[in-house]
Amino acid sequence: RLKVRALLIDKYNRNFELLKHKLGTLRITKKSAKWIAQISVTIPTNEKTGTKILGVDLGLKVPAVAITDDDKVRFFGNGRQNKFMKRKFRSVRKKLGEAKKLNALRQLDDKEQRWMQDQDRKVSRGIVDFATDNNISVIRLEQLTNIRQTARTSRKNEKNLHTWSFHRLAQFIEYKATLVGIKVEYVNPSYTSQTCPKCSEKNKAQDRKYKCQCGFEKHRDIVGAMNIRYATVVGGNSQSA
């Protein structure tokens, strides 16, 4: 049996709160010359009762848009900044590849992954806080099996789509929501970005604006979130990406 002394640094006083609960298995792994300790924690939760639903649309230009039952809307993340950073990482990666600096490439990949995870943590925390502030009982997301086919993309952001993990963001949302007793459900994503929430006719948005012949107009991602809010819930909470 090996005893290991560890220094726990907790900038936001979150981990110390977790240590108050029942601790489980300790797992130690090595990544990029650093040792990482992971401890499972059992946290009791009380699922919220009620019928208030939050629809959340995930994307690239706008990382997330959420809308409540009473039509309160919140945008999360900065798609332009994310796109700029992805291009920056890609440019540096190309130069390192041409110079055959493999160790530097691995370090850059790790740095990019940490940055993306940090963005997803911030977005997921914002969504769950917004849900809590509005007494939401259920958060609804698109079923991730088909999100890559339904995400609004163009050739110039196709590379970003294939390197950004909607699956990870959904997991972060589900994890944080569970801690505060909010249920997460997944819905059929078919036509959520095309169906008019007012008259149910299907239309294609022009750039970022959705406009229907019935007179309804909204930001296209708000339309997606509105339709996700009341779309058909699918079984199994599929999260394959």
Predicted features along the sequence, with ranges:
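Metal-dependent phosphodiester-processing active-site neighborhood
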Residues: 1-159, 170, 174-241
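Basic, amphipathic alpha-helical segments enriched in Lys/Arg and hydrophobic/aromatic residues
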Residues: 167
